[in-house]
Amino acid sequence: MENKKNFYIDGKWVAPKSKQEIKVINPATEENCAVISLGNKEDIDYAVSSAKKAYSTWAFSPKEERIRLLEKLYENYKKRWADIAAAITTEMGAPKDFATKLQAGTGAAHLKSFIRYLKNFEFEKPLGEHAPNQRLIYEPKGVCALITPWNWPMNQVCLKVAPALASGCTMILKPSELAPLSSMILAELIDETKFPAGVFNLVNGDGETTGNALTSHPDVNMISFTGSTRAGALISQNAAKDFKRVSLELGGKGANIIFKDADPDAIERGALRCFRNSGQSCNAPTRMLVEKSMYNEAVERLKKYTEN
């Protein structure tokens, strides 16, 4: 069982202030695969303080410097692709081929996309032909709290971390305590890439203690959260106290709705989409509503398909 108790704060791996720990379970084997620490308010205070300090210089870093570092991060990511995929297989039970091609692959794709977008983005430009002397200026928001789910670890992490780095924000990442291992590899890559200390920080933990301390911290300017509707509501309450900007992606699990005149393969296709990613995707159609007249047929076809 791996020891993954340390956090990445202020450009180094540090021992947590918290003494609370949790075991990470491989859902495919139901065996313990690692132990992590659950951060407390002191750990969050340290991480936010480091991010706030780094923001004073990172926010004004040249676009060319951010591009250089992101391109280096992308190259380092590709070198550890297999390690990232293996970590995802371990922490969430994803099949190896799926973890390699899609789970780790989407993380790399997001990095590449935001690098391309940053190269073409203008942080300052004329407001328009009607106001040639007025400027439209885009500024980084500040210290960001990034909280990600367990079902698409690198997809969600890179989708939040990459644009934050590109825009000049600093951040504290709290990955899901159920699937933190791939995120810790990303922290290693950011360290290897030599981003300035404090720009990126990682604190593992749960929602009740760690997440609450992070989203209610007065020096956090923005929160990006993907997860449950209940947690999103609590985060919104914390954010409202000092008007933090909030980006929420909540809920999921929509139903298949299939009528008698639907595509003949709709039932089998719905089952395939249900089981993809071990059934853990937010858009996995894990409920199937069918026209009453074809209920028995649908049950038999699903049974035959899933037994194959």
What are these regions (language model features)?
Residues 55, 59, 74-81, 85, ...:
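Structural signal for hydrophobic packing residues in well-ordered secondary-structure cores
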Residues 48, 70, 85, 107-108, ...:
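A general structural signal for well-ordered alpha-helical segments in protein cores
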Residues 39-42, 91, 102-106, 177-178, ...:
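Short beta->alpha linker loops
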Residues 40, 73, 77-80, 84, ...:
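Hydrophobic/aromatic residues within well-ordered alpha-helical segments
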Residues 123-266:
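Rossmann-like NAD(P) dinucleotide-binding subdomain of oxidoreductase/dehydrogenase enzymes
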